[in-house]
């Protein structure tokens, strides 16, 4: 994704950014909502969402059907039954400054035509950092509970929610509607969270990164008995479907919810007037925040009058009558006691700050990320310094600055990044040089498979949930088996399951016994039969993620065929000179082909010797190049001779057909193709794979059908789908052999339009493309 300011983006760059933002935010949504394991901080996530919205605002005709601005949460997990919400559970727009809070008040007034001199009342509620839930009551009795899911369809977690003491099984008092969906937040108090993590760590069990993850993971347990053992709490402060009105204002509704047995919020919501009231209450909640005993990440402002809420209505995925004013990330000062280096499975070295324990937002922090050596140098952070750390609530805290006023005297020496890996082999570290000649910020251990730290990380990746997901083989057990030499590569895991001698030794060990060993063997044997997509992902090759693994598995009938294609591609990889030319600004695939073609003759004659204008010469030598490309090439090479030699060298280093075929697979591309080829080019990788394949029954994944009414066609879904989610529609179409696109073009074969279809429907009509309703689509694919 580009870092070009939105105001400077071309339309082509905007299309590319929106596509990458959609994929990136979808990945983060799944990590946050389904896996309870966020991968970025709230601030980083909000920045991505804001860039997406800014681009869409500047280019409204480029809004994608799968735009993050149209999405709430994530699709439900398959292990829970679906629950369709009577009224969608929408998210809120965010405000990050006083100016944006004031603008919210101004927007409300403009829409309702209320003058600045008139009063508008708001309720201000603390924004609880937990997991949203909806409770359906019929005649006062709790009949169903669900998570938010994607906002329209959530997960049925009724039995789990019944275990929370704050949730009444029967409403108190009287006057409640016959049917009401009460909505709120499941959360965990900080003290209870700390106590659970401490006990789990002592028992060698999984700990959680923060209270929000803990609450989500605890509620979304298959066994409600586990949820019952967790210290979950619930605040109820909103509603969805109701059979009849029960209040005239947000404030009155909170009072009724409290009468019926719900804890609304603590500290209690407050009613404020006009824009200044919004700012004042925000300041009050910010002061209270560290004292609450649970996490809040902002204040929610809602127009108090429910009739005004009705008139304001909704826009896209959020109400016009409410907004969340987010708090900045929490900060604290502490002492940097050491800098340790962690080694990833691909050899990437990540420096981690070891800190004197400090409490930030109620959570004890002892580690913080330093990202890379360049970041350490930029901050000039030194061991012994007092540093300012920032905790965004979701990921490992980071050091944001050094408190120079507190630097010891004499000052500690500047940190020198080690030149060798911290593993016992102490192999040298290296910084890769990109094709454009720039040095990577990441240092890597050059020991590769010989490095024991990398080997352990490879094994951890192999048994991870989205790879082989072997029950009973956690990180501690894996580390112990590696240190003993029992498991040094993936195939050893399956050999262990039938090694009677080792299993007998294991049964006698403390913490194992007959049952534990039996469960371990059962978990291993259950994964001897594995899908080809999981097999590919489990290998841990660089740049080969889950999505690419699935694409590869669908394009090859057997794993052996994939390996043969990758080995052939390794013999046809592009050379460095070709890659260098391909990274020149403005040089896209077509321009690259023209330049390489010009260099194939072995000599590129100077077309205009009488001038020194290199850009002009390049334009004559390769006439169809764009002006930006000519300028970039002139700047890169400097002289005609250097340019001509570069073309000849690039042509000689052009990739062969075997590589091009692999890279041309839709969803693979050059980066993944090169990484996969280089993985299988290594002798030790091929041996490791051969050992593993001998232990497994690798199953092909389901291929898209080719004999359906839509096979080979390009489909676009637009508008609201009422009988399935957009993800379900996409999966259905792809399973039937169709390709699903996000925008309508001359290449589109069919548009499925639901209510609210806009510009895509108009474009399809203008182009004469077939359009059908959702019901017609379902009838078509059923036949």
UniProtKB/Swiss-Prot annotation:
Pfam short name (any one): DNA_ligase_aden
Listed GO CC annotations: cytosol
Residue ranges annotated for the BRCT domain, each copy included: 705-783
Record GO biological process: DNA repair; DNA replication
UniProt-annotated binding residues for NAD(+): 42-46, 91-92, 125, 148, 185, 302, 326
Required cofactor names: Mg(2+); Mn(2+)
Domain of life: Bacteria
EC number assigned by the record: 6.5.1.2
Top-tier EC class: ligase
Catalysed reaction, written as an equation: NAD(+) + (deoxyribonucleotide)n-3'-hydroxyl + 5'-phospho-(deoxyribonucleotide)m = (deoxyribonucleotide)n+m + AMP + beta-nicotinamide D-nucleotide
Binding residues annotated for Zn(2+), in chain numbering: 421, 423, 445, 451
GO molecular function, one term: metal ion binding
Keywords noted in UniProt: DNA damage, DNA repair, DNA replication, Ligase, Magnesium, Manganese, Metal-binding, NAD, Zinc
Signal peptide: none
Function: DNA ligase that catalyzes the formation of phosphodiester linkages between 5'-phosphoryl and 3'-hydroxyl groups in double-stranded DNA using NAD as a coenzyme and as the energy source for the reaction. It is essential for DNA replication and repair of damaged DNA.
NCBIfam families for the chain: dnlj, PRK07956.1
Membership in a protein family: Belongs to the NAD-dependent DNA ligase family. LigA subfamily.
Protein name, entry field: DNA ligase
Species this protein is from: Caulobacter vibrioides (strain NA1000 / CB15N) (Caulobacter crescentus)
Protein encoded by which gene: ligA
């Amino acid at each position: 994704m580009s870092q070009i300011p939105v105001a400077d983006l071309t339309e082509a760059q905007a299309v590319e950014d929106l596509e990458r933002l959609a994929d990136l935010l979808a990945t983060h949504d799944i990590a946050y909502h389904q896996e309870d394991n966020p991968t970025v901080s709230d601030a980083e996530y909000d920045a991505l969402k804001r860039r997406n919205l800014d681009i869409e605002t500047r280019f409204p005709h480029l809004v994608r059907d799968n735009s993050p601005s149209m999405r709430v949460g994530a699709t439900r997990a398959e292990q829970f039954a679906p629950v369709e919400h009577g009224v969608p559970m929408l998210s809120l727009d965010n405000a990050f400054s006083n100016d944006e809070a004031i603008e919210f008040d101004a927007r409300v007034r403009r829409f309702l035509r209320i003058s600045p001199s008139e009063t508008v009342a708001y309720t201000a509620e603390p924004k609880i950092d937990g997991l949203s839930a909806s409770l359906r009551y019929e005649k006062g009795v709790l009949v169903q509970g669900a998570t938010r899911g994607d906002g329209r369809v959530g997960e049925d977690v009724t039995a789990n929610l019944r275990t929370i003491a704050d949730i009444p099984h029967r409403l108190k008092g009287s006057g409640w509607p016959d049917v009401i969906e009460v909505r709120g937040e499941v959360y965990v108090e900080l003290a209870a969270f700390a106590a659970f993590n401490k006990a789990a760590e002592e028992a060698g069990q999984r700990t959680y990164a923060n209270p929000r993850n803990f609450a989500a993971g605890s509620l979304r347990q298959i066994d409600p008995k586990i949820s019952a053992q967790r210290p979950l709490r619930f605040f109820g402060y909103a509603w969805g479907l109701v059979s009849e009105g029960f209040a005239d204002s947000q404030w009155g509704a909170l009072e009724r919810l409290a009468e019926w047995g719900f804890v609304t919020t603590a500290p209690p919501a407050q009613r404020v007037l006009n824009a200044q009231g919004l700012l004042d209450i925000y300041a009050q909640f910010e002061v209270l925040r560290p004292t609450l005993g649970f996490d809040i990440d902002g204040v929610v402002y809602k127009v108090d009058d429910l009739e005004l809420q009705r008139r304001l209505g909704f826009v896209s995925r959020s109400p016009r009558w409410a907004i969340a004013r987010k708090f900045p990330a929490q900060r604290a000062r502490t002492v940097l006691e050491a800098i340790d280096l962690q080694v990833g499975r691909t050899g990437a070295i990540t420096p981690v700050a070891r800190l004197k324990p400090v409490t930030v937002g109620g959570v004890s922090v002892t580690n913080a990320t330093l990202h890379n050596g360049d970041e350490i140098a930029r901050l000039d952070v030194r061991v012994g310094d007092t540093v300012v750390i920032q905790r965004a609530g979701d990921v490992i805290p980071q050091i944001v600055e050094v408190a120079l006023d507190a630097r010891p005297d004499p000052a500690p020496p500047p940190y020198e990044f080690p030149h060798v890996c911290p593993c016992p082999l102490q192999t040298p570290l290296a910084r890769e040089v990109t094709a454009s000649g720039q040095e990577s910020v990441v240092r890597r251990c050059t020991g590769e498979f010989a490095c024991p730290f990398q080997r352990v990380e490879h094994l951890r990746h192999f048994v991870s949930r989205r790879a082989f997901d072997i029950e009973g083989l956690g990180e501690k057990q894996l580390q112990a088996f590696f240190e003993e030499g029992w498991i040094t590569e993936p195939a050893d895991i399956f050999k262990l399951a039938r090694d009677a001698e080792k299993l007998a030794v294991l049964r006698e060990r403390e913490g194992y016994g007959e049952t534990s060993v039996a469960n371990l063997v059962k978990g291993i044997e259950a994964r001897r039969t594995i899908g080809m997509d999981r097999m590919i992902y489990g290998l841990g090759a660089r740049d080969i993620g889950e999505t690419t693994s699935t694409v590869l598995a669908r394009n090859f009938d057997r794993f052996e065929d994939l390996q043969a294609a990758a080995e052939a591609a390794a013999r046809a990889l592009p050379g460095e000179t070709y890659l260098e030319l391909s990274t020149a600004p403005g040089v896209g695939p077509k321009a690259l082909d023209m330049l390489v073609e010009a260099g194939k003759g072995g000599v590129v004659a100077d077309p205009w010797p009488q001038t020194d204008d290199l850009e002009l010469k390049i334009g004559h030598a390769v006439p169809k190049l764009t002006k930006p490309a000519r300028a970039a090439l002139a700047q890169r090479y400097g002289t005609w001779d250097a340019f001509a030699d570069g073309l000849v060298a690039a042509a000689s280093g052009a990739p062969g057909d075997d590589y091009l075929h692999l890279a041309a697979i839709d969803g693979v591309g050059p980066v993944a193709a090169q990484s996969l080829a280089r993985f299988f080019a290594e002798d030790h990788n091929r041996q490791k794979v051969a050992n593993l394949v001998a232990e497994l029954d690798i199953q092909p994944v389901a291929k898209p059908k080719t004999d359906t009414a839509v096979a080979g066609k390009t489909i676009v879904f637009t508008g609201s789908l009422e009988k399935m989610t957009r993800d379900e529609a996409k999966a259905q179409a792809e399973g039937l052999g169709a390709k699903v696109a996000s925008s309508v073009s001359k290449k589109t074969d069919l548009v499925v339009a639901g209510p609210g279809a806009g510009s895509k429907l108009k474009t399809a009509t203008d182009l004469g493309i077939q359009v059908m309703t959702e019901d017609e689509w379902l009838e078509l694919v059923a036949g």
